[in-house]
Regions:
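Short acidic/glycine-enriched loop/turn segments that link adjacent beta-strands
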Residues: 37-41, 101-106
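Vicinal oxygen chelate
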Residues: 7-15, 61-87, 106-111
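Active-site beta-strand termini and strand-to-loop segments that position acidic
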Residues: 45-49, 110-113, 123
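Short beta->alpha transition motifs characteristic of CBS
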Residues: 10, 101, 120-124
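Short hydrophobic/aromatic beta-strand element in the GNAT-like acyltransferase core
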Residues: 42, 53, 107-109
C-alpha cells in the first residue's frame, strides 16, 4: 500500500547523536528506538508501517542547518506541552505559540540541540 500523505519520511541531522536523541525524547516525552545502519546512527520517531515518520540521523552527509525547508512536527493536542520542554532540553524557542487561524490552528518555531530550525503545530 502506498503512503497517502505528501510527506512520508524526514531526516533531522545531528552532530551529537546522543544529545539530539535526548532532546527529542525530552520534548516529546517518549523513547526513540535507535539503530546503526549503513554507517549512520538513527533514532526513529515511529516504526509503524505507513506512518509519516523519520529519524534523527548522525553520519556522513548529515549536517544540521537552520536554513532551508521548515519541517512542522506534530505538537499533539496542544503544542505548549513539547514547546515548554525545548529550552530545558537544550534548544531555543525562536517564535512562541502563534495562532494561524481558527481552521488551521497554532505553530511555534524552535532551534533544536543541534542547530536545526523546526516548527511544532497543533490545533489548540
Amino acid at each position: 500500500m502506498a503512503h497517502k500523505y505528501p510527506v512520508n519520511w524526514f531526516e533531522i541531522p545531528a552532530t551529537n547523536f546522543n544529545r539530539a536523541v535526548k532532546f527529542y525524547s525530552t520534548i516529546f516525552a517518549k523513547e526513540l528506538p535507535t539503530t546503526h545502519m549503513n554507517g549512520a546512527y538513527m533514532a526513529f520517531f515511529s516504526t509503524e508501517p505507513l506512518d509519516v515518520s523519520g529519524v534523527i540521523i548522525s553520519g556522513e552527509g548529515a549536517e544540521p542547518s537552520n536554513k532551508g525547508i521548515l519541517l512542522y512536527l506534530n505538537g499533539g493536542d496542544n503544542l505548549n506541552e513539547p514547546l515548554s520542554k525545548v529550552e530545558i532540553a537544550g534548544g531555543t524557542v525562536v517564535l512562541t505559540k502563534t495562532k494561524i487561524s481558527d481552521e488551521v490552528g497554532f505553530y511555534a518555531i524552535f532551534i533544536d540541540s543541534e542547530g536545526n530550525r523546526l516548527a511544532l503545530h497543533s490545533m489548540n
